[in-house]
Amino acid sequence: MIIPERMSVYINSLDVGNGAFLDELEQEALRDDVPIIRQDMQSFLKVLLAMHQPKQILEVGTAVGFSALLMAANTEMCHITTIEKYEKRIPVAKENFQKSGMGHRITLLEGDALAIMQELTGTYDMIFMDAAKGQYIHFLPDALRLLRTGGILISDNVLQDGDIIESHYAVERRNRTIYRRMRE
């Protein structure tokens, strides 16, 4: 998130931690270069979860299950549906859900998020998008269709640490297409 440092310090000061299981999972993910949400987003999510107390959450982009487990640990009576395409990470996420003792509150859907979202029915109180940033624009119509009136849509790191506002030529060549799509 790009927020003033004093706000970030304040939000993080409210955070009481994630517990041993999530702390260990976070360290493993960082060690293995698995992208997971940063500390400031973790704290922000916890505040939103406490304020809104969602009962149904859709997560787009499971990775190893860290965010889904964080949301499950910080809600009561909430079910999380999460979507993951990367075959290498799916069994790891499933194992983490089982080990955590919260797996009964999480449904993992395997495959392309766009195709899966088009088939989903019902509504969600919160949708958390943390997948391929360049695909967010394609996810948006279904995300809005699936979001209940008054629900919360969170798209992680859409500003790419501020790089999205840089000149086309100031951005590394490999990131130009992603940033162009995100500007749309």
Name what the model sees in each region.
Residues M1-M126, K133-I154, V158-E184:
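A short alpha-helical cap/connector motif
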